[in-house]
């Protein structure tokens, strides 16, 4: 079943032969039985990227193999880290991302140092190796695209492998259903003869529920009835990933952006999977004959059930993102009437109304493998950070004898170093952004959502262990997950549910305390309302040293928490252009009456870019001073205290 193969001796990780790793021994805490963990099983899935995307048979092979392997990995790694996949390749370094992380984790003193690695050569051998983890198969319908996501849900709950119905020669279906190593089919989402079960007519199969008129939505409501409503899924985990519609347009984004390899973590967590539009005023490109708004109403039904089965108490962690290059937007041939960014915002508004938040694996760097392996990484109980004292500020010349801010004509600047609101972007870009040799030369406020430690704990730990004194960490949008917090406030639009602020505060405080965070570097209001008094109180309970919302008052001190409204995005590639933008905007802000504290957002910029941009800023206006986050926000708080009454 493999289209490519290499001997063990031919596979290298950063110049280290895999055969050399086999001589290493593991430095992990022994299990309760005292036994050492077994070897890591390594499977190379990169052959699925080395295909001709114009050939349907090769595209189907890539989809089928990635889907089955990801689900298998989620099952195998549910309780311990055993199966590791080699898949994604860096666009900025000539390295495989998964090998990068395996190398890092295998360094002396590392989590995996000395643990033997055994390569598995073929998909058939991989399945045979882990046959004891698999109860059988769930077969889904190539003519009802939504059934591929339903199959991922079923796979996680019932310990099954998802297989697309395809009786053509050489298909995965032929191997696993009709071949010598066949497995029992435990769940059919299509007739054994290939006829569709979900037709958009009559009643939803196996239920008394009337059809929605959409086979797509009927499949999801069948899933809801049998898995979410029945409490068999964990409602605290959802997964918004592109369904098998990808097979029609594999080149609309990076070839790895089917994001099937992202499924493993959510399969392990028994999450519910979906791919639905969020607009009530248009029909989706993948289901144009449905009644207007059916996708949205189906999504709301899923979210409400999830809310009642874990989300109410724990929030709903939803991996993935709007598949804007393929569906639901104006981009290319995605067939929608709304632009991608408003569609993102509307999606955020809807899920937040049910206590949902995004772990937003967005296009460009959305593919991620091995999260079900990484989730077992042994984090420290806490990662502390020091906040600056007023005595230290005075000693550094920032405060006068009366304890007031000494501006001396200076303009204080801070950059929001983002966007790290999803595990996939952090996993992909650490090697070229964090490991940039210029890091440490200027202060940088790294804004990373702390909830990413569920899927990429090794990256967050690596950053903390290798941080310089100029690296400080704050939370990304909008806290411990990308949630529109105004939609947690009563009255709640869309859902009409009770206030969700207490659940959000408990959720965020757990992660902020673990990672030593006290600043939320950006809060996106988007299509939701601004924070009201209760919402500000919520953030003050876990982010007391500052927030930067996208709306509301330009400056505010709320119960001691400094609030600074966001300003421009500065994302010019040329540092000279970026510097001119910053300098001009600071001058404009001052004429508009803003205080000499300035925040600008940047997306996936390297430390080298920041060094060169700040050098160029200094050449234009040496009075502009880039500060570290504690200094910036503490000075801003002191300044606000001097301005008179604050929010009580």
Provide a role label for each language-model segment:
Residues 1-18:
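N-terminal secretory signal peptides that target proteins for export/translocation
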Residues 19-30:
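Bacterial N-terminal signal peptides
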Residues 29-37:
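Bacterial Sec-dependent signal peptides at the C-terminal "C-region" and cleavage site
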Residues 36-381:
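Preference for solvent-exposed, low-hydrophobicity sequence contexts
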Residues 46-68, 83-97, 104, 111-112, ...:
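Acidic-and-aromatic substrate-binding clefts and catalytic sites of carbohydrate-active enzymes
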Residues 292-323, 413, 417-441, 451, ...:
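Catalytic grooves of carbohydrate-active enzymes
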Residues 371-464:
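Active-site beta->alpha N-cap acidic-glycine motif
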Residues 449-510, 514-517:
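Substrate-binding cleft of extracellular glycoside hydrolase catalytic domains
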């Amino acid at each position: 079943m493999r289209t490519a193969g290499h001997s063990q001796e031919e596979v290298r990780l950063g110049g280290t032969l895999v055969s050399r790793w086999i001589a290493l021994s593991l430095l992990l805490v022994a299990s309760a039985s005292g036994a050492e963990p077994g070897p890591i099983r390594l499977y190379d899935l990169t052959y699925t990227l080395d295909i001709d995307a114009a050939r349907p048979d090769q595209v189907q092979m890539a989809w089928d193999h990635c889907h089955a392997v990801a689900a298998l990995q989620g099952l195998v790694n549910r309780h311990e880290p055993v199966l590791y996949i080699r898949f994604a390749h860096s666009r900025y370094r000539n390295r495989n991302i998964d090998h990068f992380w395996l190398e890092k984790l295998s360094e002396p003193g590392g989590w995996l140092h000395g643990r033997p690695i055994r390569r598995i050569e073929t998909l058939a051998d991989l399945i045979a190796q882990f046959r004891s983890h698999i109860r059988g198969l769930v077969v889904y319908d190539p003519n009802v695209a939504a059934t591929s996501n339903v199959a991922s849900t079923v796979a996680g709950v019932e310990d099954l492998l998802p297989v697309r119905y395809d009786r053509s020669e050489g298909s995965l279906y032929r191997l696993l259903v009709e071949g010598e190593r066949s497995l029992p089919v435990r769940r059919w989402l299509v007739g054994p003869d290939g006829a569709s079960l979900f037709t958009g007519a009559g009643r939803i199969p196996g239920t008394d529920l009337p059809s929605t008129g959409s086979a797509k939505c009927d499949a999801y409501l069948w899933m809801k009835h049998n898995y979410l409503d029945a409490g068999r899924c964990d409602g605290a985990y959802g997964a918004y990933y592109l369904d098998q519609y990808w097979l029609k347009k594999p080149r609309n984004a990076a070839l790895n952006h089917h994001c099937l390899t992202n499924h493993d973590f959510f399969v392990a967590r028994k999450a519910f999977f979906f791919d639905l539009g969020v607009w009530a005023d248009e029909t989706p490109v993948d289901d144009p004959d449905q009644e207007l708004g059916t996708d949205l109403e189906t999504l709301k039904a899923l979210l409400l059930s999830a809310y009642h089965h874990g989300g109410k108490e724990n929030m709903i962690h939803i991996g993935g993102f709007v598949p804007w290059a393929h569906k639901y937007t104006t981009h290319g041939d995605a067939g929608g009437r709304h632009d991608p960014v408003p569609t993102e915002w509307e999606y955020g508004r809807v899920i937040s109304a049910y206590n949902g938040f995004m772990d937003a694996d967005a296009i460009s760097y959305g593919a991620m493998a091995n999260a079900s392996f990484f989730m077992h990484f042994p984090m420290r109980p806490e990662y502390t950070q020091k906040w600056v004292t007023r005595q230290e500020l005075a000693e550094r010349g920032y405060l006068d004898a009366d304890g007031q801010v000494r501006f001396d004509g200076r303009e204080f600047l801070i950059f929001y170093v983002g966007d790290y609101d999803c595990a996939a972007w952090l996993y992909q870009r650490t090697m070229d952004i964090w490991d940039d040799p210029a890091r440490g030369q200027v202060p940088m406020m790294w804004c990373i959502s702390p909830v990413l430690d569920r899927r990429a704990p090794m990256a967050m730990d690596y950053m903390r262990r290798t941080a310089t004194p100029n690296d400080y960490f704050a939370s990304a949008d909008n806290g411990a997950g990308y949630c529109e917090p105004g939609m947690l406030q009563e009255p709640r639009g869309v859902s009409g549910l009770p206030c969700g602020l207490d659940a959000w505060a408990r959720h965020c405080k757990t992660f902020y305390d673990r990672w030593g965070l006290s600043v939320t570097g950006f809060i996106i209001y988007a299509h939701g309302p601004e924070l009201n008094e209760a919402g500000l109180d919520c953030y003050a309970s876990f982010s007391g040293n500052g927030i930067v919302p996208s709306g509301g008052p330009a400056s505010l001190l709320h119960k001691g928490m400094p609030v600074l409204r966001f300003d421009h995005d500065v994302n010019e590639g040329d540092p000279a252009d970026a510097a001119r933008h910053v300098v001009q905007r600071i001058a404009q802000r001052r004429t508009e009456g803003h205080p000499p504290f300035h925040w600008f957002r940047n997306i996936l910029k390297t430390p080298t870019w920041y060094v060169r941009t700040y050098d160029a800023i200094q050449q234009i206006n040496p009075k502009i001073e880039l500060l570290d986050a504690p200094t910036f926000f503490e000075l801003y708080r002191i300044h606000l205290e001097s301005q008179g009454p604050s929010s009580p």
